[in-house]
């Protein structure tokens, strides 16, 4: 939008630009940045303030307007960008989402209904997480909101923050394995790559391997084929890496997994 207004080419942003350009309060994981040791942390600004949960209906409306603009190959109105995108997010993913804060400053990821949805994706993801917990899986803490829309909004509590708000280093399996978007069963990558990382780099190896096995079996049982490397993560503890709570589990009713389940098959 800025490039169009200033009549200049779009500037290409590097991975580091995305990492440092995010609001400091909501940046995923434990990284914070300064220009020099004696300066303040960068991107601590009121203009980048994370919206409160009470504004959820306005955020859903902004998300829908941005999606509508994309469908029509148009630039969205700046007011929607200011409301939803300007605070910054390092969350990624295909669905419309944003960071929000509860009254006690707890951080949540809010996943909004999409204009393309033909079923209640948020409610099904909530149901999947409840099933996962019943199956003994360490799953992210989530809840759903009925906001007057056709479908529910899912709220997933950020697990890279302690109860007191302290930061915990997080990295996706894709990052820790040195892979790229699109690396999956089609490029001969799969769960055994994650197994190798756990054996070589994690603490409490046996427990993490058992946890991963439960997640593989569960994803197959519910038909969650969106199990790519970004949807598996690790937290860094004082003793080493451990699997993060499971997240983004949603039935997609696909016969094949995104990742190889064995050395040769993703079925």
PLM features: residue spans?
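Phosphate/dinucleotide-binding and metal-coordinating scaffold of catalytic cores
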Residues: 1-267
């Amino acid at each position: 939008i800025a490039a169009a207004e200033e009549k200049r080419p779009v500037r290409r942003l590097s991975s580091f630009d995305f990492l440092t350009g995010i609001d400091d309060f909501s940046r995923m994981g434990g990284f914070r940045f300064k220009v020099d040791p004696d300066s303040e942390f960068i991107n601590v600004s009121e203009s980048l303030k994370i919206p409160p949960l009470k504004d959820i209906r306005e955020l859903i409306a902004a998300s829908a307007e941005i999606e509508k603009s994309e469908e029509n190959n148009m630039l969205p109105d700046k007011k929607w960008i200011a409301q939803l995108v300007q605070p910054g997010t390092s969350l990624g993913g295909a669905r419309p989402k944003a960071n929000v804060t509860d009254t006690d400053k707890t951080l949540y990821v809010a996943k909004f209904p999409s204009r393309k949805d033909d079923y209640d994706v948020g409610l099904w993801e909530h149901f999947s997480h409840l099933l996962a917990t019943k199956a003994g899986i360490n799953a992210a803490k989530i809840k759903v909101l009925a906001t007057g829309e056709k479908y529910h909004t899912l709220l997933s509590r950020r697990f890279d923050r302690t109860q007191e708000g302290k930061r915990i280093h997080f990295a996706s399996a894709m990052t820790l394995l040195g892979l790229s978007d699109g690396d999956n069963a089609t490029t001969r990558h799969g769960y055994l790559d994650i197994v190798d990382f756990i054996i070589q780099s994690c603490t409490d190896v046996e427990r993490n391997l058992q946890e991963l096995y439960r997640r593989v079996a569960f994803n197959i049982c519910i038909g969650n084929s969106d199990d790519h490397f970004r949807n598996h993560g690790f937290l860094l503890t004082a003793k080493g890496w451990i699997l993060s709570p499971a997240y983004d589990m949603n039935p997609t009713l696909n016969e094949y997994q995104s990742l190889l389940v064995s050395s040769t098959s993703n079925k």
